[in-house]
């Protein structure tokens, strides 16, 4: 049974998750080499920029989701963000993404925040079914994006 834990307490998985994210969202990292992103992501576990919750099973990393201080530089007035949701292919179809997302939402609410944002180019229907609302559509990285929010 997978357990959800904070990456800051299991930093041996930071570089792997950062690499998965760099590959999955390559269009967002065109100007940022992997090593730079790995350093930023690891530092973010301590400074609050990228507070990541991960799924582990027998100390094997299955995926993660982050609470990001700023995930869309063009919209600095919006914060915080659900970001970096990724499940390894072999661990999909087990409900892990939804568990991670709901736990990020619960932790955010427990800290007194009442709204979360996200952006997606291909999962707006998935998030809409889980209580997220489209705030606007925009183009970034050559793709149509949906800016979504969820009141907690």
Place the predicted regions along the sequence by residue.
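Conserved hydrophobic beta-strand within the GNAT/NAT acetyltransferase core sheet
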Residues: 85, 116-118
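Active-site rim helix/loop that mediates acceptor-substrate recognition in acyltransferases
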Residues: 26-54, 62
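Conserved beta-strand in the GNAT
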Residues: 52-54, 60-70, 81, 86
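Conserved acetyl-CoA-binding loop-helix of GNAT-fold acetyltransferases
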Residues: 87, 93-106
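Conserved active-site alpha-helix within GNAT-family acetyltransferase domains
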Residues: 114, 121-144
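Conserved N-terminal entry element of GNAT/NAT acetyltransferase domains
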Residues: 1-16
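Helix-loop element at the rim of GNAT/NAT acetyltransferase active sites that forms part
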Residues: 11, 18-32
């Amino acid at each position: 049974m997978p357990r959800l834990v904070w990456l800051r307490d299991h930093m041996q998985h930071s570089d792997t998750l950062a690499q998965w994210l760099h590959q999955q969202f390559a269009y967002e990292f065109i100007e940022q080499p992997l090593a730079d992103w790995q350093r930023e992501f690891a530092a973010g576990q301590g400074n609050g920029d990228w507070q990541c919750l991960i799924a582990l099973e027998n100390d094997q990393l299955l995926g993660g989701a982050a609470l990001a201080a700023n995930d869309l530089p063009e919209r600095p007035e919006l914060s915080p963000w659900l970001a970096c949701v990724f499940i390894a292919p072999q661990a999909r179809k087990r409900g892990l993404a939804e568990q991670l997302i709901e736990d990020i939402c619960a932790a955010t609410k427990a800290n007194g925040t009442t709204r979360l944002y996200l952006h997606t180019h291909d999962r707006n229907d998935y998030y809409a079914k889980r209580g997220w609302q489209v705030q606007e559509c925009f183009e970034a990285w050559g793709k149509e994006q949906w800016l979504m929010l969820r009141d907690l």
